[in-house]
Amino acid sequence: MVAPLRIAPLGLWIRLVDAVDLSLGRTRGLLPARVGPSLFGLSRGVSFLMLKIACTLLILTLAQWTSALAQEVPHAFTGAKIIPVEGEPIEAGTLLVEAGVIKALGPAGKVAIPATAKRFDLKGKVVIPGLICTHSHIGGIGGGDGSGPVQPDVRIYDSLNVRDSGFRRAVAGGLTALNIMPGSGHLLSGQTVYVKLRGSKTIEGLCLRDKEGRILGGMKMANGTNSQRAAPFPGTRSKSAALMRAEFIRAGEYRDKLAAALDDPEKKPPRDLRLEGLVEVLEGRRVVHHHTHRHDDIMTVLRLSREFGFRVVLHHVSEGWMVAEEIARAKVPCSIILVDSPGGKLEAVNLVFKTGGILEKAGVLTAFHTDDWITDSRLFLRMAGLGVRGGMSREAGLKALTLAGAKMLDLDKRIGSLKVGKDADFVILNGDPLSVYTKVLETWVEGRKVFDRGDPDDLLHAAGGYGAGVDQDP
């Protein structure tokens, strides 16, 4: 493979800034008391500080310029088997990427490669879309506290640590986009956030946004045993449903008051952050991602969704195979997890491999998720193989890792398949994606490499070893 044009990650630039700091620190004592009139006769300390700031800005400017230059150079990936998910696999195909998006793909000889393109020989490799996890907790669970069971004003991205090693392990597993959620210990634990694993060192750099710049995400809800405990939390399933009905009724009344006030600030009710989030749910602007296991709990979610008209994705659905027809009639998608190790809890005792196949046959849109740490993100790819073993078709198994999840997050126009105009998020494998022996070689997000198994530091997060599970400042 031709060595790719690698852009140093921000962590490296930070280390360079630190090196500048160290170097200047060592020479600081050599500076005269006054550096000269060019620095306006400032003191040695102030002059030194200004010099350090100037060096830092220069380095960061170069980093930005280099990154932009790399994204402008077309990249042509040739010779691989390309599985676009939307469309038939392409043997010995070519994938052309430029400015972070897919410009062309097709059989060898059918794609015009610009003379300026950087070429990557992927003969013998397999290229698939970037993997999408619809339910993850990496970066620190955070979310609601013990003050009450319903907390729609809580935003998970206010508590995420982007330097958490889970992000490095996720790209090592081929993941390129996530729905990061609060935990499930509440009836409603807060707002989720949809992120791209671009390698940014701030949460703002990871968040996906709409055309108006608003951060995208859903709303996390749960029922069953997780949210049942001492007051003020509910103690029964019936009380859980009653509390949520009351909250949605209040949100509907708040929405109606806002609508009646039009643009008159004097008529508007006092701003209520709790109810604002629920109004977004009622208006369909925020999808509910609902943790639920038992078949009766699943039916309760469908009942509430029908009553209040909110959009919902069912998560886990350990007993979803028992009510697959009911889920299909409600036209509600399911995000499932396949756990092949013992443990868990009693309400998930009927979780089986055949769930995906049964849901597919019933016509239910089905995706997989990790619920990381329940399943390590590095093992996400193998869920397709487990699902196919349990009865899913090969096509549905691959979609469950990619396009199905994108649809559940309303992101399928941007990600989830390899298609002209979509974001250049893809994974390079050394074999069949359904084989448990297949490894992720490289992960690319928006046309930039974010994981390379050939890099010793990346390999550490892919295969384990000393330091792999320790959160470190990159």
Feature locations, PLM:
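Boundary at the C-terminal end of the N-terminal hydrophobic targeting segment
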Residues: 68-72
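His/Asp/Glu-enriched, well-ordered alpha-helical/loop segment
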Residues: 143-145, 149-154, 287, 328, ...
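Bacterial N-terminal signal peptides
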Residues: 52-64
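Histidine-rich, glycine-flanked metal-binding segment
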Residues: 73, 82, 86-128
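Polyanionic/metal-chelating signatures
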Residues: 166, 171-312, 439, 473
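Active-site gating loops and adjacent loop-to-helix segments of metal-dependent hydrolytic enzymes
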Residues: 144-160, 201, 218-220, 268, ...
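C-terminal cap of metal-dependent C-N hydrolases
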Residues: 80-83, 419-463
